[in-house]
Every structure is written in structure tokens, then in C-alpha cells.
Amino acid sequence: MGAVILDGRAVAADILAELTERVGRLRGQGVLPGLGTVLVGDDPASHAYVAGKHRDCAKVGIASIERTLPASASQAEVAAVIDELNADPACTGYIVQLPLPAGLDEVAVLERMDPAKDADGLHPVNLGRLVLMRPGPLPCTPRGCLELLRRYEVPIAGADVVVIGRGITVGRALGLLLTRRSENATVTTCHTGTKDLAAHVRRADIVVAAAGVPGLVTPDIVKPGAAVLDVGITRVIGDDGRARYTGDVHPDVREVAGWLAPMPGGVGPMTRAMLLANVVEAAERQAGFPAAS
């Protein structure tokens, strides 16, 4: 019997339907949420990802505000766009598509954002609020992982969780989320300096692979019945010479795990859904609506 597939596409569709209703209530009060995107450069993957975000906006009734700059844009030019969106009342929240082209200071750009308009939850102020367990926009991918586990009723309280990867967008932030009292998991963060990764993974009830190493998590190191979430994505060249994207989890893990969020179709759609959730929640806060349960 194989793993239960954690279908991020299906869950994300449910979330978008829920958000559509909430946006309708906001519109009834004269509030139109708006998502801004700042895209610098001509990376095809970034352009495709941003286009997907705006398609999602159209589905739920959120206005789109697009700002695109060439790869040659200076730090000052990017800063000017940030200042514009900070001041624009039509922009409820916005994201800066990362990575930025070489030569631009990503941290300086993120720090310049209005924390209240940080739709990605990556502003230093909002990450600090997460550390302090205070309300605020949450990083989208970690929030998507957590919501996917909840919707499939995967036990989290008291679970031993291994997160492979210590990047701020997934690994470190996810550990902070899962150790809140509302989740009460015990989290081990593994990385390139971890000795005997397999030993850590074997005892985990939940494994989140976000290292960017294809096939890193193999069936022999997964506890039978564990939940495994594949967040890794790496561009590789196949035997046929064509490029494709692959995750961190070996396909055969589905024969051992109890639950599996595959790549693609698992966490990715949830990340986009959580971005819109952050925008809608920001609009509700601004309108004085009670916090959603």
C-alpha cells in the first residue's frame, strides 16, 4: 500500500475558493485587495512564476499591480519601485521576485519594504515577529507545508520533524512555525554540516526536504508511515539532453511513506495559495475585519 498523496493542487483550489468568498465580502465593504509584484531581469522561470501569481489573483478577484525592470536596473531604480508600492494605497501587499540579478543587494531591498505590505513574510521585521510568536504575515512556503499537513490531518503535535535545508525561505522559518505552541512539534534542522543525515531522517515522523539535492531522501532512510514533503527543486539535464526539474525525494519513497507531498504538485501550489492568503488577511486587517480562524 503506497503513501497517501498530499495533493497540493486540490487543496490550493479549495483555498482559492475560500479566498474568493472573503474577497467578495471585502469588495462589499468597498475594499479591493491588490497584489504587487516586482520582477527584475529576464529569467524565464521567474517570469512564469510571477505570471502564475497574477492568474491566481484573477481567479479570486484580487487586483494585480505589476512592476518589471530590466536586468540592468540599478539599486536606486529598484528602490524607487519599492517606495512607489509602499505609498500606493491600491497595493495591499507585494513581493519582490527572488533571486535578484547579480549586483543588487537583496537584503537592502527587502528591508526597504513596508513590513505591513510584505506578502512573502520575509521582511526582517516579520521574521522577527515569527521568532517572538507575534501575529504577522508568514513565509509562504513554510505556511503552505503546514497547511497541507493540517488539511490531510497528519499528526503534528509531539511529532519528530526533520527539516533538511536551512535557507530562510523554508528551513529556518518552518522550524519556527512548527515549534509554536499551536503545533508543538520537535524540529531538527539538518544541513550540509550534519553528520549522519540518514540517522536523523530514520527517526522522523515528518520529513521536509528542501536542500536542492536531487534524490537526497531515499526509501531506505525513511521511517515506514512517515510524512514526507518534497520542497526541493533542481534543474537537471536528462539522458535525452533535455532540461527538467526534479525534487529532493526519490520516487520510490512513496512505497514506504504514509503521506507524500510530491514535486511537482505538492507544496508548490500551496506556496502560491498562501501568498494570496497573506494579501487577503492584510486587506481584512486594514478593513478592521476580525481575524480568520
From Swiss-Prot:
UniProt xrefs under InterPro entries: Aminoacid_DH-like_N_sf, NAD(P)-bd_dom_sf, THF_DH/CycHdrlase, THF_DH/CycHdrlase_cat_dom, THF_DH/CycHdrlase_NAD-bd_dom
Pathways involved: One-carbon metabolism; tetrahydrofolate interconversion
UniProt keyword annotation of Hydrolase present: yes
Residue positions binding NADP(+): G165, R166, G167, T192, I233
EC number per UniProt: 1.5.1.5, 3.5.4.9
Catalytic activity: (6R)-5,10-methylene-5,6,7,8-tetrahydrofolate + NADP(+) = (6R)-5,10-methenyltetrahydrofolate + NADPH; (6R)-5,10-methenyltetrahydrofolate + H2O = (6R)-10-formyltetrahydrofolate + H(+)
Gene3D superfamilies, sorted: Leucine Dehydrogenase, chain A, domain 1 (3.40.50.10860), NAD(P)-binding Rossmann-like Domain (3.40.50.720)
One Gene Ontology term from the biological process aspect of the record: tetrahydrofolate interconversion
Gene Ontology terms for molecular function: methenyltetrahydrofolate cyclohydrolase activity; methylenetetrahydrofolate dehydrogenase (NADP+) activity
Domain of life: Bacteria
Keyword list, A-Z: Amino-acid biosynthesis, Histidine biosynthesis, Hydrolase, Methionine biosynthesis, Multifunctional enzyme, NADP, One-carbon metabolism, Oxidoreductase, Purine biosynthesis
GO cellular component: cytosol
Function (record text): Catalyzes the oxidation of 5,10-methylenetetrahydrofolate to 5,10-methenyltetrahydrofolate and then the hydrolysis of 5,10-methenyltetrahydrofolate to 10-formyltetrahydrofolate.
Subunit structure: Homodimer.
Family, as annotated: Belongs to the tetrahydrofolate dehydrogenase/cyclohydrolase family.
Protein name: Bifunctional protein FolD
Source organism of this protein record: Acidothermus cellulolyticus (strain ATCC 43068 / DSM 8971 / 11B)
High-level lineage: Bacteria, Bacillati, Actinomycetota, Actinomycetes, Acidothermales
